[in-house]
Amino acid sequence: MAQLAGQPVVILPEGTQRYVGRDAQRLNILAARIVAETIRTTLGPKGMDKMLVDSLGDIVITNDGATILDEMDIQHPAAKMMVEVAKTQDKEAGDGTTTAVVIAGELLKKAEELLDQNIHPSIIIKGYALAAEKAQEILEGIAKEVSPDDVETLKKAAVTSITGKAAEEEREYLAEIAVEAVRQVAEKVGDKYKVDLDNIKFEKKEGASVHETQLIRGVVIDKEVVHPGMPKRVENAKIALINDALEVKETETDAEIRITSPEQLQAFLEQEERMLREMVDKIKEVGANVVFVQKGIDDLAQHYLAKYGIMAVRRVKKSDMEKLAKATGAKIVTNVRDLTPEDLGEAELVEQRKVAGENMIFVEGCKNPKAVTILIRGGTEHVVDEVERALEDAVKVVKDIVEDGKILPAGGAPEIELAIKLDEYAKEVGGKEQLAIEAFAEALKVIPRTLAENAGLDPVETLVKVIAAHKEKGPTIGVDVFEGEPADMMEKGVIAPLRVPKQAIKSASEAAIMILRIDDVIAASKLEKDKEDKGGSNDFGSDLD
């Protein structure tokens, strides 16, 4: 409602909530900080897990920031921006999702303190933008170059990523799998390497222990051989991939065939059989002894394939067909009649095996496969899911290093270095922006402080010790949460890709700046149905309760 010459003017529908100026900023900052506080306790190797139960009673137990925020049904728009920070970090860097959200929350906390001192949001925004830009430059300066062939360093980065997750006991073993998988599918483009993570397939099966998790240099497909008479094991396999059905197709036109005698019916059936026989003969003729079909296989075609000793699998997913092509070197053929010996792929072994009581097809021993499978095992569904999340993060971290060739110490070391250097930079900038840059630097200390806090250490005492050691010994000094003392993270093998902190600071600062720009929130009243679903409230601020 507005007033013009003493007359109230209604421009928004009834029930609309509006928050202006400091109220709007305070509300948004509070919402974003609540999200950051929620996942702060999961940060680091000693971080705790969260148990999330959805409306159907399904349970997720994890300490992965992106997963936690994805599973939470967050309503507040400013809080949703924090979820986007985690999603962007996960997509771009693969790890550091909790770090990014915690930094964003702390930046907003420090911004609120500046707002309380009557510093204009525009000045804070400018200072934060300058600090974020300078931070990228500082990180580039302290990064160490590493070769994609340095397996030990890649493994250390993978171990750092897995530490603190449910799969921690097997971190060395899982790190080896992650490194081997990425190096196998990496392709050289010019003088750089590119890794397409779509070429690494994750298959999960409950049962056995996490140590039974294995890397298959080929593809594992959750299907079974279509006919009991077919071989279940084929060595020196010649593999055909058919993107069609081994069936007699129905015509597209609504034609009718009038059959007036038994002879005509017999001829019709014989022709159908002949067509199916020709398809199978073609597969045999080109030398294939294993065939994967994206669609169905007629019963008669199955019979002939079994008779010829050809293993066949039907209704294979398109994504699996593409992985089979990359692993075996086969070409996907649309029509069986176009199949040639050159289209066939090769594998040392194709075998149907029972895993956790279910049949699966293993295609192994491919020559230099550009698609691999990680078969994940674990005692329960929750363990298997968390091992998958840990491996996905580890694989992404290794990918970052292989592609960029640069690493940093972890354990809060980069954030401490940034805090020290940005404090110096703030003095060069001067003006009111100096206050914002100093606030940015102070906000970054939340990472080493939280790492210490989550490990049961005194956060203030630990931070003072680490900063003193860092200034004395250099930018690789961070928080050793196991010993409770400052330590050289590079020597300890606690490392991360350069891409992770760079993206975390970029995403966090952009989100904080976006939230600080908002000085007016107009929230329409919810529809009646939504009100019932949400318990009848249409108060925008009530989403924070």
Curated annotation (Swiss-Prot):
Cited function: Molecular chaperone; binds unfolded polypeptides in vitro, and has a weak ATPase activity.
Name under which the protein is recorded: Thermosome subunit
Lineage, top ranks: Archaea, Thermoproteota, Thermoprotei, Desulfurococcales, Desulfurococcaceae
Keyword match Chaperone: yes
Annotated PANTHER family: CHAPERONIN
Listed GO MF terms: ATP binding; ATP hydrolysis activity; ATP-dependent protein folding chaperone; unfolded protein binding
Pfam families: Cpn60_TCP1
Subunit organization: Forms an oligomeric complex of eight-membered rings.
Ranges in coiled-coil conformation: none
Species name: Desulfurococcus sp. (strain SY)
InterPro entries: Chaperone_TCP-1 (IPR017998), Chaperonin_TCP-1_CS (IPR002194), Cpn60/GroEL/TCP-1 (IPR002423), GroEL-like_apical_dom_sf (IPR027409), GROEL-like_equatorial_sf (IPR027413), TCP-1-like_intermed_sf (IPR027410), TCP-1_chaperonin (IPR053374), thermosome_alpha (IPR054827)
Keywords recorded for this protein, A-Z: ATP-binding, Chaperone, Nucleotide-binding, Stress response
SUPFAM superfamilies named in the record: GroEL apical domain-like, GroEL equatorial domain-like, GroEL-intermediate domain like
NCBIfam families (UniProt xref): thermosome_alpha, thermosome_arch, thermosome_beta
TM segment ranges: none
Gene name for this UniProt entry: ths
Keyword ATP-binding found: yes
The family this protein is said to belong to: Belongs to the TCP-1 chaperonin family.
